[in-house]
């Protein structure tokens, strides 16, 4: 049962997230030979100010 977690900065529309989840599901199903019903995609909208690579705050854009 594949679980796919995607962290993105906030700002994508619901339609974009739906398309992303569908396309990720297609690829995982094809490559991992897993039934689509067994694939779970989690999309986490990260507010600005919550990501600090190398100790520095990453801003959108």
Swiss-Prot record:
Keywords: Isomerase. InterPro entries: 4-OT-like_dom, Tautomerase/MIF_sf. Transmembrane segments: none annotated. The active site is at residue 2. Its EC number is 5.3.2.-. Gene3D superfamilies: Macrophage Migration Inhibitory Factor (3.30.429.10). GO terms for molecular function: isomerase activity. Belongs to the 4-oxalocrotonate tautomerase family. NCBIfam families: PRK02220.1 (NF002571), PRK02289.1 (NF002622). This is Probable tautomerase SMU_1087.
């Amino acid at each position: 049962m594949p679980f796919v977690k995607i962290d993105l900065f906030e700002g994508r529309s619901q339609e974009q997230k739906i398309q992303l989840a569908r396309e990720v599901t297609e690829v995982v199903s094809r490559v991992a030979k897993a039934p689509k019903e067994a694939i779970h995609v989690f999309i986490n909208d990260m507010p600005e100010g919550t990501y600090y690579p190398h100790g520095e705050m990453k801003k959108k854009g």
